[in-house]
Amino acid sequence: VILMAGVVYISFQKSDRDSYILTFSDKLLQTEFSGVRAVKVYASDTRHAWLEQACVNVVPSTDGKTRLFSPESEYLKISQDADTLVICLDLTNYDLPEQKKKYLIPGLQAKGLQLTIEADANLAFLTNTIRGLRTNINGIKTDSLATHIQSGEVRLDSCEIRALYVDGDGVTFNAHQSIIPYLYLDLDGVRNWGVHECTIGTEHLTGSETYHRNELQKGECKKMIWTPKKEDAVLHVTMKEKGCLVLQDE
């Protein structure tokens, strides 16, 4: 089901630095889906593009249905593949002037891409591989959720998730006022993380390299478990409050 929420537009303009700007409208389309357990957000082109004022918001559905609110655009391809909602930013047909096509990597800036997903409690996996597209997860209550993020921030706010998995490439993870009994962070992909007014039971960390500058924040978790992927992997943790360190074999 697709409902028009208003008149929409896309505008292009050239900047002073010979780059081109694609501006998405804030007028939205509403699309309804059923049986969604996973969301995949990605870009299909390989051109040098960067995003500004762009994010994907995941919020709870009030009636058990999954809905997507997105700008109307020829560059957004939206579909459902089995239980996966697929959102593709496809800029391969972006029309450049003939002289610009001679450059190996034309510059393109995409502004104002705002996606909102109303998800039910069955959502279990979210992947966002568009660089610069921030991920916000607000008010979600579910048993488990796995996220894979490409070079961007994922922010969790006012959520209750029994088991949360975070990995990807160059991820910044921040949790605010959330309850997470089991938090799993893959440090090969999670660049840094912060916990703010949260209740976390066990924090599971894994990785294959040497990780410095990991400061255990006050009240961050009740227990931390380090599981290296390689024998020479090293985790450095700074503790600033009273605690107990227990070493044990597998």
Locate predicted features:
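Intrinsically disordered, low-complexity terminal regions
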Residues: 1-149, 154-157, 167, 176, ...
